[in-house]
């Protein structure tokens, strides 16, 4: 006789319901992916479906539309987001609430350390461990307010009333706890809740105790563990695979990758999503601003530039086109992303093969993804109304060597061999170490390029990076002036002494008179009107117009501005148009060089180049004058 006969109909239903729950729990427990067992690309349904018939060898595919072999109706997964009214997504309530906040670092203002030796000692220890002032970070609220540094017209912008959901992915390794959590809270506080599906923290084998159980306890205590997930690796994977692992676990329609020392500005999300909703093969990058590594002050980096590279594979920037400058709130095409900050539809990411899994730790991933986005019929834009601030580490390199040899050259070789066609030889000529590296097995990535019927790198250079050669040519143009720069008053020469970025420099005895003196005095006035040591891409740079403004060395960007100098022949002055000042040294030649108001009668501002091509100098400076007009 069955038990059911002794139960009421209601009790019978309850038992059936409980049994169903137990069954579902068993199924979930069986199939759930462990945070400690990240999947391979082949286990991602979209990637598996797309890659199962990747071509082998020279197998050819029939003529297809630009969206080559991407599936049937799934070619347009975001059609449901089109045709809706455009609305303002500004969160005025949150904005007004932030206005009332007070405390250290609020509104992105700088914070200073307390003036006592014990604090300085502790702060230095944290500085060395992180590469930024983590002591200051601990003084600032995790929910701090920030200054709205967007263009004023951004607050008037409207976007589709219906937008895709997102997974925000933060890979990190030994990140300082409060800096990591502030990154998380900036996303939660400034994202529409209906769009933010999850935040995935990818812990790349961190050893700091605070990043283990205390971090998980914090998320639970503050009731954000339902949206913030932690994925932990079992060994050091590196930044590239960390992002990949996060993408593999993501469930949002759009993936957004951010560094774990970031703070998002107001209404940062809709400007990233709207272009992707219009075309799922569009990748969108925010403007990246600066969080000062010393004070945590948030300030704008600039008002935009197009990403690019030089032929040593250093990331560089190209100026905006006239059309882009006239539309300061409109997304603009950019050949190459900076790397750490971008949004991409999950479908497009996996159709492109995700990140090349042969890339180790970091380096080259921004080129690999940028080239294949453009060459494989997608596009990439920067969105001026989406702004995210980033800490650029300074002074200390806190992480251990990966112990993998020259992985950067190997990464670059993989990118060049798959995507750059005959242009790779120019790269190898400038960086022989890349050409000599072992790229490993490239069959999968070359197969993806073939299946997507991607365009040539020659097309990319001529249509997308069309002005690349003007600013970063494969063959360096002749200098307008070169050699020693002799200071008339002291009879000493400018010597940059092989110093690095952000360092100041001064005068030393001229090398032509002191063959054993060493130093770095062979300088060039280039076609971009910047001054740089021979063979190096580091330039004289002046960033302020105050009296006795310092002149430092900074990575050459070939975009003039702070690095634009003119040589005034009759007065022998080195003039800096942006500050309106002239290069000056003390009479005895001691101390660092600086800028002062121009005085044509002062010998302290007179400089003699060793060699000048007068005709070329006049021609270039005349052209520069026309451009400025």
Swiss-Prot record:
Recorded GO MF terms: carbohydrate binding; metal ion binding; polypeptide N-acetylgalactosaminyltransferase activity
GO annotation terms (biological process): protein O-linked glycosylation
**Residues involved in substrate binding:** 204, 236, 362, 393
The record describes its membrane topology as: Single-pass type II membrane protein
- The record places the following residue ranges in the Cytoplasmic compartment, namely 1-12
Q: Which InterPro entries match?
A: GalNAc-T, Glyco_trans_2-like, Nucleotide-diphossugar_trans, Ricin_B-like_lectins, Ricin_B_lectin
Transmembrane domains' residue ranges = 13-33
Q: Which reaction does it catalyse?
A: L-seryl-[protein] + UDP-N-acetyl-alpha-D-galactosamine = a 3-O-[N-acetyl-alpha-D-galactosaminyl]-L-seryl-[protein] + UDP + H(+); L-threonyl-[protein] + UDP-N-acetyl-alpha-D-galactosamine = a 3-O-[N-acetyl-alpha-D-galactosaminyl]-L-threonyl-[protein] + UDP + H(+)
The keyword Mitochondrion appears for this protein:
no
In Pfam terms, one family for this protein is Ricin_B_lectin
Point out the glycosylated residues in this chain: 143, 177
Fetch the SMART domains from UniProt: RICIN
Describe the function of this protein: May catalyze the initial reaction in O-linked oligosaccharide biosynthesis, the transfer of an N-acetyl-D-galactosamine residue to a serine or threonine residue on the protein receptor.
Into which family does the record put it?
Answer: Belongs to the glycosyltransferase 2 family. GalNAc-T subfamily.
- Name this protein carries in UniProt: Putative polypeptide N-acetylgalactosaminyltransferase 10
**Could you tell me the gene encoding this protein?**
gly-10
């Amino acid at each position: 006789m069955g038990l059911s006969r002794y139960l009421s109909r209601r009790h019978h239903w309850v038992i059936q319901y409980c049994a169903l729950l137990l069954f579902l729990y068993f199924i979930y427990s069986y199939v759930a992916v462990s945070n400690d067992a990240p999947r391979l690309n082949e286990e991602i349904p979209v990637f598996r479906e797309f890659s199962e018939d990747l071509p082998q060898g020279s197998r050819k595919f029939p003529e297809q539309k630009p969206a080559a072999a991407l599936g049937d109706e799934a070619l347009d997964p975001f059609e449901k987001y089109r045709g809706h009214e455009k609305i303002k997504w500004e969160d005025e309530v949150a904005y007004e609430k932030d206005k009332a906040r007070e405390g250290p670092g609020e509104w992105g203002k700088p914070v200073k350390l307390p003036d006592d030796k014990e604090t300085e000692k502790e702060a230095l220890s944290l500085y060395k461990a992180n590469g930024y002032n983590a002591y200051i970070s601990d003084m600032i609220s995790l929910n701090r307010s920030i200054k709205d540094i967007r263009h004023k017209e951004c607050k008037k912008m409207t976007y589709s009333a219906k937008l895709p959901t997102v997974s925000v992915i933060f890979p990190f390794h030994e990140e300082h706890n409060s800096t990591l959590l502030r990154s998380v809270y900036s996303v939660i506080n400034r994202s529409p809740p209906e769009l933010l599906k999850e935040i995935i923290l990818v812990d790349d084998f961190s050893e700091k105790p605070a990043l283990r159980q205390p971090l998980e306890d914090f998320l639970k205590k503050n009731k954000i563990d339902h949206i913030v997930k932690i994925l932990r690796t079992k060994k050091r994977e590196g930044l590239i695979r960390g992002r990949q692992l996060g993408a593999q676990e993501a469930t949002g329609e759009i993936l957004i990758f951010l560094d774990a020392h970031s703070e998002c500005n107001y209404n940062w999300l809709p400007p990233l999503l709207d272009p992707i909703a219009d075309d799922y093969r569009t990748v969108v990058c925010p403007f990246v601003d600066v969080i000062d590594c010393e004070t945590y002050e948030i300030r704008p980096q600039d008002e935009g530039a197009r990403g690019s590279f030089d032929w040593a594979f250093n990331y560089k920037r190209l100026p905006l086109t006239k059309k882009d400058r006239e539309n300061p709130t409109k997304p603009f095409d950019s050949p190459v992303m900076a790397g750490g900050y971008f949004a991409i539809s999950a479908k497009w990411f996996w159709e492109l093969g995700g990140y090349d899994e042969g890339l180790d730790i970091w380096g080259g991933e921004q080129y690999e993804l940028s080239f294949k986005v453009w060459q494989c019929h997608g596009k990439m834009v920067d969105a001026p109304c989406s702004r995210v601030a980033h800490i650029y580490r300074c002074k200390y390199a806190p992480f251990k060597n990966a112990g993998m040899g020259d992985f950067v050259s190997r990464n670059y070789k993989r990118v060049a061999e798959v995507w750059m066609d005959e242009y790779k030889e120019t790269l190898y000529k400038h960086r022989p170490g890349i050409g000599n590296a072992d790229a490993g097995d490239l069959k999968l990535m070359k197969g993806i390029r073939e299946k997507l019927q991607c365009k040539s790198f020659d097309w990319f250079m001529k249509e997308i990076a069309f002005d690349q050669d003007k600013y970063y040519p494969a063959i360096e143009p002749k200098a307008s002036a070169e050699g020693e720069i002799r200071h008339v008053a002291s009879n000493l020469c400018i010597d940059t002494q092989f110093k690095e970025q952000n360092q100041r420099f001064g005068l030393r005895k001229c090398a032509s008179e002191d063959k054993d003196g060493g130093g770095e005095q062979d300088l060039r006035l280039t076609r971009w009107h910047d001054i740089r040591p021979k063979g190096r891409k580091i330039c004289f740079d002046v960033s302020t117009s105050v009296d006795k403004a310092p002149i430092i060395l900074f990575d050459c960007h070939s975009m003039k501005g702070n690095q634009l100098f003119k040589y005034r022949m009759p007065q022998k002055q080195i003039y800096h148009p942006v500050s309106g000042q002239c290069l000056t040294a003390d009479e005895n030649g001691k101390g660092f060089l600086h800028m002062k108001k121009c005085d044509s009668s002062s010998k302290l501002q007179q400089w003699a180049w060793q060699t000048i091509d007068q005709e070329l100098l006049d021609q270039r400076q005349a052209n520069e004058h026309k451009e400025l007009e």
